[in-house]
Structures are given as structure tokens and as C-alpha cells.
Amino acid sequence: MAMLGAEEFGFATSALIVLGCVMMRKCHMNTCPVGVATQDEELRKRFHGRHEYLVNFFTFLAREVREYLAELGYTKLDDIIGRTDLLMRKPSDHIEKHDLLDLSRLIHLPEQAATQTIHQVTRQLHAIDNVKDVDIIRHAKAAIESGQEVSLDYAIANTDRSVGAMLSGEIAKRYGNIGLPENTLHIKFKGAAGQSFGAFLAHGIHFRLEGEANDYLGKGLSGGLISVRPPVRSNFDAEKNTIAGNTLLYGATGGEVYINGRAGERFAVRNSGAIAVVEGVGDHCCEYMTGGRVVVLGETGRNFAAGMSGGVAYVWDKDHTFDYFCNMEMVELSLLENSTSRKELHELVRQHYLYTGSTLARTMLDDWNHYVDEFIQVTPIEYKRVLAEEQMRKLQQKIADVQRDY
């Protein structure tokens, strides 16, 4: 690959095999028989991989590469990058189809290679000096440095990627994970946001998007608030249309997201603390979720809650078909029978209406006693057991305190 021009190489699968992977292709099913890709405690006991195995593997790999380089008369990998003239085609194996292959264009070495370097010698220019975050940071200086409330307005296009990441980085430099005080920085955007809108958004920032968003909205969300709604003049039903892409809230640890419309696949994958309300999702929603709350006011795709080990999801099951779309290996379904869950769901739907003006949320709130009975609560079995044990521990402590006082 180096001779064909590669300068970076991936070893993911081979490294997993060194650690014991037997390629059963069950990584997504939580049934890995050797404990590499599973949350099952019994299966994880079967994992016998050690870091020394990886050290040995890459040491021997590097040694073999050095030996091949020595055979060719070179001392560094850089010396052979792009050197297609060093490649030779195997002799014919007399298979007619193989003889028809013309590899000349693949292994062609340009004339410029004799006078110019054909491997990387200068760092890539990422051109981040003029991205939108630079302007936001400049205008939000009062909020960042002294905590004053600041409101800003921007147009946004799908070429504006990772908006909010550099801003949150500036805040993290000063305040760490604490972020800014509540409701310090309000920024309204209009347009189609690019990928990773609101990535790693820090506490105290509210991004309000009027338009639509691409994939990875709220990636690594760290306490910020993002609300998305269709353009004010749009005439379509928001709850029937997708206005945000795939893999939203990937790895989020905190914060809130309210979307007045549907989202794509893998919504809230690896969410570990954020709150989200959306009006429909694609496949694999809440995949590997470990914490937080997710409310789906609409249809879901298949494989809902696969690998979900923490947090709680509430799904509006108006057609009574949700159990077909839910992966039941690690979760259980129930109606909202206790007042705590009902109050929590009501508050989340109310907040969704306040931030997005959702027509669907308003309809539900106006006839709450009817709609609340159509919701299904999704709770991880192990998570529910831990909560029950914690409640029992608190009850026992309370009884012990009463007995001590008397």
C-alpha cells in the first residue's frame, strides 16, 4: 500500500484478532463469545487479551517491514511511498480473465516523481482562521470572559461544520467542565447547518437553529442546549418530515436537545447523560446508551435500544407496534404507571414546546391524560435493578435513622 501512495495504515481488525477476536460478526448483538465486544458480564469474563500481545504484534510487524525495506535497499518507509515503479506484476497464471486486467494506469509513475517529493512533507492547511466560530468567539467575548448575557444571530450553510466546537473549547480553557452560567450565550442560526453542529457544546450556551441540520448534531454535547425547528414560513407538518441527519448526540455527556421534526438513524448512540426530545427517528435509536433521557414523539425504526445499558427512553406508541421495533435483549417495556415517570415525561414535552413551539407537543399537553397512556417506557433491565437496590438502600437507611432516634 505504501508503494501505491498510502501514508497512513489501519490495523483495527488485526489488532482485535491479536486480542482474541474470532470474527463471529456479532459485535452489534452483545453476544461476542470471546468477550471483546459485549457488555454481558459473563461473556466479558472470557476476554483474555493483554496489552503485551499488541506490543509484540506491532513490534514484529515493524521488524518485518524493516526487513522488506532492507531487501529493496531502503532505510525508511518514506523512501518507497508512491514508488509504483518498484511493483511487479505476477507471472500469468493462464486464467483468461486475469490476463485481461490492465494495471498500467494503477502503477503509472508520473515524470514529476523524479524531481518532486511524492510523500507528505508539509502539514495540511485546514483553513480554520475564518470559520464561523472565530467570529462567534470575537462577538461573545463579554460572555466568555465575564459571564454577561449575549445574544447573536447568524446565517449558516452546510459548509459550516463543527460550529460551536472551538467556542466550547475557549470556554473549557477557562472554566473546565463547569462551563458558563445558565442562559449566558444565546445564538440563533438560520439555514442548513453542516455536520457536527453544536459539537461538544458547553454549559450555558443555547444554539437555536431555524432550518435543518446534517449528521452528528450535538456530538459529544457537554451541557449546552440545542433546539431545532423548521423555517417559520414552511408549510409542511414538522412531525412528518426529517430535519436532522444521522448519529445525533453521539457520545453526549450532558445538555439538552429539542428537535421539532424527525431525525435519522442512530439517534442518541452512546448517549451517557443528555436529554433529548424528537418527533420520530430511524433505525438503532438509543444504541449503546448508558445514561440520560430520550423522548420520541413519533415512529421509530428497527433495533431500538440495542445494547442500551442505562438511562430511560419514552416512546409514543400510538399504533401499538413499538415492541416489534425494539431490541429486547437488554431492556424491558412498560406503561407509565408511577407518578414520577409521568411528571418527568410531562416536563420534557413541555420544555420541547417552549423551545420549539411544536404543534404536536402543544396537542399532547392540551389532552395530556389521554396521550400519556399511549407512551411506552424503555428501561434497561440491569439499570432498573440498580435503581431498585438504591431505593431499598435509602429506605433501609431511613428506617435505621428512625430506629436510632427512638
Describe the residue ranges of each PLM region.
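Short glycine/threonine-rich loop-to-helix capping motif typified by GTGT followed
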Residues: 1-5, 85-98
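Flexible glycine/proline-rich, aromatic-decorated loop/lid segments
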Residues: 2-43
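Glycine-rich, histidine-containing beta strand-loop boundary motifs that form or position
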Residues: 12-15, 76, 211
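Sliding clamp-binding short linear motifs
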Residues: 12-15, 19-24, 90-110
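Long, distal/terminal scaffolding or interaction modules
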Residues: 42-47, 51-72, 81-84, 105-406
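Compact, charge-rich alpha-helical regulatory domains located at protein termini
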Residues: 77-80, 87
